[in-house]
């Protein structure tokens, strides 16, 4: 059973289920070299993802467009904050080159927040989708966008380019937003996801939250209900891991049994797909999950 009690993680040793092997393989090195040669950023490195070794060894990577400097300063995130670089107009082409050379069946594109841009970078997302469609027409495309706060209908620019999956992470429960995600608004994120689904119901919508930040079980279940009300198809739940001493503390380490509980409840609430485990991240096994999403939708139609 899942407990509401938050056990402090101060001075706690990271449990065995959160330990991963250091990245080291020929495939990992070749993926790393290609990404560097094309001058692309990845959230895998910038956000210090624990799954980088496994994913890059399989030639899977989540590309981060619009630079590596974010205009927000979320308490959980390892991406640098400051004044962003100018938008690189050649980046969509280089990204399409990487997708083609890696032979990707599924690509995930994310970005830093770009509050300095009039559309938050939405048109750049759309260009990336268009270039990939032209050069790798069989590759499925998943976007993980910012919230486009105060950028009127910027999400629609991305949705019109017709990604296969539109992901926007809710990140945490409403009561922790001021502490964890102060530059964002919970209901703005919910509305974005719902508007995408209303605009084009064929686009799979996806969102994720981190646990272990101080939330209660009841709050997590309420987020599930809110996301289902917004017609979100796919939910991911993973353990928050503190990137450095300057980031927000881990409240507790959530056990694998608790993740199983959350997954079971989420499925009962009607999500087409649920991925809930300590090491789950938004784009972890994204290609496999996309294929399963398509199968689940077909089963529901039949």
Curated annotation (Swiss-Prot):
UniProt cross-references to SMART domains, sorted A to Z: Elp3 (SM00729)
PROSITE patterns in the record: RADICAL_SAM
Binding-site residues for [4Fe-4S] cluster 2, renumbered to this chain: 70, 74, 77
A Pfam family it matches: Radical_SAM
Subcellular localization, as worded in the UniProt entry: Cytoplasm
Residues where [4Fe-4S] cluster 1 binds: 44, 49, 55, 283
Cofactor descriptive note: Binds 2 [4Fe-4S] clusters per subunit. One cluster is coordinated with 3 cysteines and an exchangeable S-adenosyl-L-methionine.
Reactions this protein catalyses: [[Fe-S] cluster scaffold protein carrying a second [4Fe-4S](2+) cluster] + N(6)-octanoyl-L-lysyl-[protein] + 2 oxidized [2Fe-2S]-[ferredoxin] + 2 S-adenosyl-L-methionine + 4 H(+) = [[Fe-S] cluster scaffold protein] + N(6)-[(R)-dihydrolipoyl]-L-lysyl-[protein] + 4 Fe(3+) + 2 hydrogen sulfide + 2 5'-deoxyadenosine + 2 L-methionine + 2 reduced [2Fe-2S]-[ferredoxin]
Record's keyword terms, sorted: 4Fe-4S, Cytoplasm, Iron, Iron-sulfur, Metal-binding, S-adenosyl-L-methionine, Transferase
Pathway per the UniProt entry: Protein modification; protein lipoylation via endogenous pathway; protein N(6)-(lipoyl)lysine from octanoyl-[acyl-carrier-protein]: step 2/2
CDD domains: Radical_SAM
Source organism, top-level taxon: Bacteria
Any one GO cellular component localisation term in the record: cytoplasm
Family: Belongs to the radical SAM superfamily. Lipoyl synthase family.
HAMAP family linked: Lipoyl_synth
Name this protein carries in UniProt: Lipoyl synthase
Gene name of the record: lipA
């Amino acid at each position: 059973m899942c407990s509401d009690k938050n056990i402090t993680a101060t001075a706690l040793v990271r449990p065995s289920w959160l330990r991963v092997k250091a990245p080291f393989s020929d495939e990992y090195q070749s993926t790393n070299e290609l990404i560097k040669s094309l001058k692309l950023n990845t959230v895998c490195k910038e956000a210090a993802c624990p799954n980088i070794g496994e994913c890059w060894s399989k030639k899977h990577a989540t590309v981060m467009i619009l630079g590596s400097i974010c205009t927000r300063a979320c308490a959980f995130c390892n991406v640098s904050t400051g004044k962003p670089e100018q938008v690189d107009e050649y980046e969509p082409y280089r990204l399409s080159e990487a997708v083609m050379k890696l032979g990707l069946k599924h690509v995930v594109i994310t970005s830093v927040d770009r509050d300095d841009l009039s559309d938050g970078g939405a048109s750049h997302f759309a260009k990336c989708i268009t270039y990939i469609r032209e050069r790798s027409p069989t590759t499925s495309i998943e976007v993980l966008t910012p919230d486009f706060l105060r950028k009127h209908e910027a999400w629609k620019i991305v949705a019109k380019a017709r990604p296969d999956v539109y992901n926007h992470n809710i990140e945490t429960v409403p009561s922790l937003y001021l502490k964890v995600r102060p530059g964002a608004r919970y209901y703005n994120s919910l509305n974005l996801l719902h508007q995408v689904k209303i605009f084009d119901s064929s686009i799979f919508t996806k969102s994720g939250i981190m646990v272990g930040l101080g939330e209660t079980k009841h709050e997590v279940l309420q987020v599930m209900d809110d996301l289902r009300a917004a017609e979100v198809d796919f939910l991911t739940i993973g353990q928050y891991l503190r990137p450095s001493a300057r980031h927000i503390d881990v409240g507790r380490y959530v056990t694998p049994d608790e993740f199983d509980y959350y997954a079971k409840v989420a499925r009962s609430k009607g999500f087409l797909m649920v991925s809930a485990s300590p090491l789950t991240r938004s784009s972890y096994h994204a290609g496999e999950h996309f294929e399963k999403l398509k199968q689940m939708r077909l089963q529901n139609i039949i």
